[in-house]
């Protein structure tokens, strides 16, 4: 069996691995990076344009990022954190555009699409107004607008207001400089750039079949791979491995045997979209409009009506409709969930299952929805919606985190988490939303945990501050810094109105 060496091995050909590869390459071009993807091409799973919402998640419109506390107060800290993290992504993307203007055009992966939150009924309007008041007072959200005026709302979202009854009353907030991001296109841009360098290697149609320490603790990792076309096998020896393979990252993390993986499990959730086939309707809507999830629904099923810009062409999607699945990837196996059950996480899985039985029941019910039932959900957004204008399509899978919880055996978490070996030689990304939008901040966290000495060096610090001007400072606490950074990114990425 052939054996090769790589300083950095990345499992998965999506936005996370591509972002980490680009960061590492910019920080130390001499490092040899190997990316492994089991499908014929990169960005075919969750990073693919129709496999995710494409929302530049900035906390502007996603109401699940501003929950109530037990006393009914609206909490905005999570929205502030996500907004600041998205600003980090915008800075890095701006740096890449400025560094390679001949080959990277902002509109090829990011476009301005206003972000709106819309609710109906007095109770939900009161919640949205309280949310707006708190967010508007913070400099990161100072440009947010509010309206209950019918004409203003018709200007903001004409398709949604057409044919709408006066009751229930509707209200909305709007941020003009919201973004739609094609993470599949961005992934391909990053990898295309990396492939021009001799120290980067991409292996497609290649599956990881084993992962272990080459010669025991403190030694490089041995990543055994198999080409799915030729059946040829080889071993990649690498001092650092990143597992960014979506839901399958959990399987690989478990196979690594690191102590930190104990207790972790996964709860897969499927997704479906209704995609508009009527160009006249598509032209009438230019926004991402989010509302509140139904009672008992998971956060990733918050309904939204989205303008998408895919390959330069506007599209209109509604959803997602969440459902129960046992697959961890869109191209995965029905046995993915079963294969993830281990003695060390059995208690976590039982606890999470017991405490989330209503959620499981909800997801199973969603799977069996008819087209007419899905259309009923859409009609809350578009009163005159016609079934013949919309076609069902499958989105990517989301594997939510299950982990140990002393009080409940196990708990289900919505979000992302980095699980890393104590010595920093291996890291895995688990979970889902906000995911791709905060990929740069997340991958910087990986570098800080796994390359601590290099990240503190003057050389890397200087490079990081060139790529990300706010690095090491707080956009949440520094209004002047935030304003400066936002002017720079909105101008560079052509997101200003």
UniProtKB/Swiss-Prot annotation:
Q: Which reaction does it catalyse?
A: (S)-malate + a quinone = a quinol + oxaloacetate
Q: What is the lineage of its organism?
A: Bacteria, Pseudomonadati, Pseudomonadota, Gammaproteobacteria, Aeromonadales
Q: What class of enzyme is it?
A: oxidoreductase
Q: Name one GO molecular function term.
A: L-malate dehydrogenase (quinone) activity
The record's annotation in Gene3D superfamilies points to:
D-Amino Acid Oxidase, subunit A, domain 2, FAD/NAD(P)-binding domain
Source organism of the structure: Tolumonas auensis (strain DSM 9187 / NBRC 110442 / TA 4)
Q: Which cofactor does it need?
A: FAD
Q: What InterPro entries has UniProt attached to this entry?
A: FAD/NAD-bd_sf (IPR036188), MQO (IPR006231)
Q: Which GO terms describe its biological process?
A: tricarboxylic acid cycle
Q: What is its pathway?
A: Carbohydrate metabolism; tricarboxylic acid cycle; oxaloacetate from (S)-malate (quinone route): step 1/1
- EC number of this enzyme: 1.1.5.4
Keywords from the UniProt entry: FAD, Flavoprotein, Oxidoreductase, Tricarboxylic acid cycle
The entry's family comment says:
Belongs to the MQO family.
Spell out the protein name for this chain.
Answer: Probable malate:quinone oxidoreductase
């Amino acid at each position: 069996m052939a054996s090769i060496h790589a300083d950095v091995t990345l499992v998965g050909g999506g936005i996370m691995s591509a972002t980490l590869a680009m960061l590492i390459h910019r920080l130390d071009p001499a490092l040899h990076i190997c990316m492994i993807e089991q499908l014929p091409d990169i960005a075919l799973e969750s990073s693919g344009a129709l496999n995710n919402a494409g929302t530049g998640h900035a906390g502007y419109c996603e109401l699940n990022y501003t929950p109530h506390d037990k006393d009914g107060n609206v909490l905005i800290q999570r929205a502030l954190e996500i907004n600041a993290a998205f600003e980090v992504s915008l800075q890095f993307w701006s740096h890449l555009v400025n560094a390679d203007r001949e080959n990277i055009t902002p509109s090829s992966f990011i476009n301005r699409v206003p972000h709106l939150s819309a609710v109906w009924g007095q109770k939900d309007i009161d919640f949205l107004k309280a949310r707006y008041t708190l967010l508007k007072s913070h400099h990161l959200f100072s440009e947010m607008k509010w309206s209950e005026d019918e004409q203003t709302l018709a200007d903001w979202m004409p398709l949604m207001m057409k044919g709408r009854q006066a009751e229930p009353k509707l209200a909305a907030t709007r941020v003009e400089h919201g973004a739609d991001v094609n993470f599949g296109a961005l992934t391909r841009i990053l990898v295309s750039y990396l492939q021009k360098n001799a120290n980067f290697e991409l292996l497609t149609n290649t599956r990881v079949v084993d992962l272990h320490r080459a010669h025991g603790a403190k030694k490089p990792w041995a990543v055994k791979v198999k080409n799915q076309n030729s059946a040829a096998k080889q071993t990649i020896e690498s001092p650092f491995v990143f597992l960014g393979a979506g839901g399958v990252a959990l399987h690989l993390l478990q196979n690594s045997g690191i102590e930190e993986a104990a207790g972790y499990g996964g709860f897969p959730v499927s997704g479906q979209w209704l995609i508009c086939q009527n160009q006249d309707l598509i032209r009438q809507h230019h926004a991402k409009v989010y509302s509140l999830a139904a009672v008992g629904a998971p956060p990733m099923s918050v309904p939204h009506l989205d303008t998408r810009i895919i390959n330069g062409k506007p599209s209109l999607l509604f959803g997602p409709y969440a459902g129960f699945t046992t697959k961890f990837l869109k191209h995965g196996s029905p046995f993915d969930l079963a294969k993830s059950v281990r003695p060390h996480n059995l208690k976590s899985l039982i606890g999470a299952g017991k405490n989330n039985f209503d959620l499981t029941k909800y997801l199973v019910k969603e799977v069996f929805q008819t087209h007419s039932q899905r259309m009923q959900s859409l009609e809350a957004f578009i009163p005159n919606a016609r079934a013949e204008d919309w076609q069902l399509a499958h989105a990517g899978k989301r594997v939510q985190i299950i982990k140990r919880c002393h009080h409940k055996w196990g708990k289900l978490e919505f979000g992302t988490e980095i699980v890393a070996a104590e010595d920093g030689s291996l890291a895995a990304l688990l979970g889902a939303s906000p995911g791709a939008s905060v990929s740069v901040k997340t991958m910087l966290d990986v570098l800080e945990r796994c390359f601590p000495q290099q990240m503190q060096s003057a050389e890397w610090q200087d490079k990081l501050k060139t790529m990300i001007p706010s690095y090491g400072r707080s956009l949440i606490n520094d209004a002047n810094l935030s304003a400066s950074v936002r002017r720079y990114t909105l101008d560079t990425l052509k997101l200003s109105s």
